[in-house]
Swiss-Prot record:
Transmembrane region(s): none
Record's signal peptide: 1-21
Stated name of the protein: Conotoxin Cal6.40
Tissue distribution: Expressed by the venom duct.
UniProt domain comment: The cysteine framework is VI/VII (C-C-CC-C-C).
Entry function: Probable neurotoxin.
Localization annotation: Secreted
Species classification: Eukaryota, Metazoa, Spiralia, Lophotrochozoa, Mollusca
Cellular component GO terms, alphabetical: extracellular region
Organism whose genome encodes this protein: Californiconus californicus (California cone)
Cysteine-cysteine disulfides: C24-C36, C29-C41, C35-C50
Alphabetic keyword roster: Disulfide bond, Knottin, Neurotoxin, Secreted, Signal, Toxin
An annotated Gene Ontology molecular function: toxin activity
Main subcellular location of this protein, as a coarse class: secreted
Amino acid sequence: MSGSGVLLLTLLLLVPLSALAKECSMYYCSGGDFCCPGLKCGDPTGKKICIEPGK
């Protein structure tokens, strides 16, 4: 694979990740950590849920 092909592939992978990270940073766990909607905030008991600021 040429260098430009690798670069293009890397960019294609990074764009969705950064978009996802941006969306996730708009939400936070009850513990204060950023998270994505629908995730359990890394709490095995599932008590901490992901909430949108201002709600």
